[in-house]
């Protein structure tokens, strides 16, 4: 999945760099947006949510969950940011529902309530699988919760983002916790 995203980014950048006119750029923008709205967002809406709670750890190109895959909290934060931003851009209720679900999952299952930070991975029941805390994941958690607040006005997301920032970056990171 990572290779595909990197390849798409490189392709998009190359095409954009070679665009000869504003019309070419506009055509490319329209095609990319169409792919986002018609393919990418629906794929995640239809396949990411695990009926047992949270999100699948990995999904094949066929849309089927890969059993036993680790559930990275960074994925939850990325889903949250993506659908909050999509809701803010397009105003579709289904995007808000997905963003709200992701926010609740992130807040309730992925954050270390005692010391701050996002755990690296959780299991299917929401229990900590890998308690390592990476600054990148925590920063993306703050970023995604902030976007959720911006898109929906959800105060719990803003308060959680502020608390995460205070515990993690203002008070300092305790590597033992």
List each language-model region with its residue ranges.
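Bacterial Sec-dependent N-terminal signal peptides
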Residues: 1-23
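Glycan-recognition and catalytic cores of secretory/periplasmic carbohydrate-active enzymes
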Residues: 20-177
């Amino acid at each position: 999945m990572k290779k595909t995203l990197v390849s798409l980014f490189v392709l998009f950048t190359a095409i954009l760099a070679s665009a000869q006119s504003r019309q070419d750029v506009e055509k490319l923008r329209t095609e990319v947006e169409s792919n986002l709205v018609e393919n990418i967002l629906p794929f995640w809406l239809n396949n990411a949510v695990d009926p047992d709670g949270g999100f699948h750890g990995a999904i094949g190109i066929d849309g089927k969950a890969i059993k036993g895959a680790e559930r990275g909290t960074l994925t939850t934060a990325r889903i949250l940011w993506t659908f909050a931003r999509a809701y803010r851009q397009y105003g579709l209720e289904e995007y808000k529902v997905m963003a709200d679900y992701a926010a609740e999952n992130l807040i309730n299952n992925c954050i270390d309530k005692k010391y701050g930070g996002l755990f690296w991975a959780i299991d299917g029941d929401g229990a900590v699988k890998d308690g390592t805390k990476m600054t990148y994941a925590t920063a993306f958690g703050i970023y995604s919760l902030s976007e959720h607040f911006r898109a929906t006005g959800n105060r719990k997301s803003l308060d959680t983002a502020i608390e995460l920032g205070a515990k993690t970056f203002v008070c300092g990171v305790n590597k033992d916790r």
